[in-house]
Amino acid sequence: MEISKHIYLATTEGCEACRIMERILKQVQRDNVYTFSIQVRDYKLLPEFIRVDLVLTDFPTLIFLENNVIKYNVTGTMSAKKLQEIIKDLHFN
């Protein structure tokens, strides 16, 4: 069975940090051979199971899913290097 890996970037309207994090996330994926998909969504439009499981109050928030199970979430911006470390630690690479 193939493992499905997704990273959701939860955003909100007018969030400059969200736009910065989106650029970093997409650049990290482009610069590496990662097979996860990236989904950028306003927090109100996230899948219901994410909105039920996580109380999102700060943005941007990255949500790491494996087979539709939340493995990890982190709020705020970070460097590309830090994001790569998280991806490696979670075996999302």
Where on the chain are the PLM-derived regions?
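Thiol-based oxidoreductase modules, predominantly thioredoxin-like and allied folds used
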Residues: 10-12, 33-48
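Residues at alpha-helix termini
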Residues: 32, 52-54, 90
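Short Fe-S-cluster ligation motifs
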Residues: 43-59
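Short alpha-helical
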Residues: 16-17, 45, 78-81
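Local sequence-structure signature of Cys/Sec-based thiol-disulfide redox active-site neighborhoods
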Residues: 1-34
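Non-catalytic, surface beta->alpha helical segment in thiol-disulfide oxidoreductase systems
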Residues: 58, 63-93
